[in-house]
Amino acid sequence: MTKFVFVTGGVVSSIGKGIVAASLGRLLKSRNYTVSILKLDPYINVDPGTMSPYQHGEVFVTDDGAETDLDLGHYERFTDTNMSKLNNVTTGAIYQAVIHKERRGDYQGSTVQVIPHVTQEIKERIRRVARETNPDVVLVEVGGTVGDIESLPFLEAIRQFRKDVGRANVAYVHVTLVPLIKAAGEMKTKPTQHSVKELRSIGIQPDVLVCRCEQPLPRGIKEKISEFCDVPVECVIQAQDAPSIYDVPLVLEQEGLAQRVLEILNLDPQQPDLREWELLVQRLHHPQEQVEIAIVGKYVRLTDAYLSVAEALRHAGLALNAGVTLRWISSEEIEERGPEALLSGVDGVVVPGGFGNRGIEGKVASICYVRERGIPFLGLCLGMQCAVIDWGCHIAQLERANSYEFDPDTPHPVISLLPEQKDVEDLGGTLRLGLYPCRIMPNTLAAKLYGEAIIYERHRHRYEFNNAYRSLFLDSGYVISGVSPDNRLVEIIELPSHPFFIATQFHPEFRSRPNRPHPLFLGLIEAALRSRPQPRPLQLQKMG
């Protein structure tokens, strides 16, 4: 029977529940257990697709086209397992389903209430993950903080769940904070005690406490937490701040988290095989070379808006024994100061995705700058569209060339609305979403990087290259190196006269893994290394 581990958080938000859940997933997988991870988000949005990146961070897209919480990116990268729409559930989606059932008459005249109808729907979503993916263990991260009114239905549902499936089949892991009062030099356990008290008042007794801390927890502090929170001292897990998120699985393994959870679930605590992960962490902390990559974006005030892009760059650096330093640059600041002032000295540039016309001129100016100076460049989604606008304006001599999204009155809409989007009125869930095939043209940079004729990548867009300008762009030196199998949609463009200039309509960052870096990011970092004073031979690897 599938076992269930529920991960909750207390004291403060953003305490690291997602990384703890992802790390535990990695540790269980290293013991040959299959895992699936579900994120329960307490906001009333049906999904994060229409939320501001400044409020939510990145929207992570799965193969089946779900727009999900960025934690699903951590789950995929840490467990090397694809997630789906099953793995992210929001309050909005729960209430939408409950109201739909009520309108359909499923409740047969009952008064629809939080208990039992909403909690039953939540439990059904948890069971559905177990039923359809059939893992040994389902990890469930409950978003928000214990005490938040929005989280109460989820906490009540997971309280009931242990009774429904049996005590031996459920473990509760609570992530909390043990702050250090630096003026006094003391670590305080009261926030943890009150957080557990709040959780117990709901009816949940945590089995394991994962305590975030700046310094190692003394034995006496662990014993005090154990005494006041009614948790065995060996189940008080120290989670000291780590140099990187990729250190966390090793930190938690050293503390015995996976072993404690497996004992609670009556599963065999096998010996883990973490050799590959340990090698990754060793490479991360001891790079042989260093490169600096600029990310020119609209939302750089919150770098989590580009989380998968940043991680994909680091993955490529790991494979090449190179440390990757990121220079975050606002495209609006480039509009004010010019690209020379902000991009000078970088080894490569990424222009990632986004929506709306704010900061677009800065993105286009950045692309023009790297194109003219031979700086390695990778454009993603909107980044490709801006590269097309740059070429249309400056090389193809199309006056006021632009995207229809930014200027509906442009005489040259080199980027146009997808035909199937013309009658769409709703914003949420209506983009071209999910995994689609792409045919790679032979004898191109894309063909060299991928090493395959047909690839599959994840999309999230509403606009596309305007085929009315395809011949003009080809005649002026552009190469279209990737198209949809029916040749209708342009998916990859590149410049053969440039050392490394490639841009995609899709989002390759979503498929990069620490142990399997994406070939486009690998190519960018390798090109950045070659552009430095001591060039290195090409060491590209195919995606597995």
From Swiss-Prot:
CTP binds at S13, D148, I149, E150, K188, T189, K190, P191, T192, Q193, K224. InterPro entries: Class_I_gatase-like, CTP_synthase, CTP_synthase_N, GATASE, GATase1_CTP_Synthase, P-loop_NTPase. Pfam families: CTP_synth_N (PF06418), GATase (PF00117). It comes from the Bacteria. It is an enzyme of class 6 (ligase). The keyword DNA-binding does not apply. It catalyses: UTP + L-glutamine + ATP + H2O = CTP + L-glutamate + ADP + phosphate + 2 H(+); L-glutamine + H2O = L-glutamate + NH4(+); UTP + NH4(+) + ATP = CTP + ADP + phosphate + 2 H(+). PROSITE patterns: GATASE_TYPE_1 (PS51273). This is CTP synthase. The gene is pyrG.
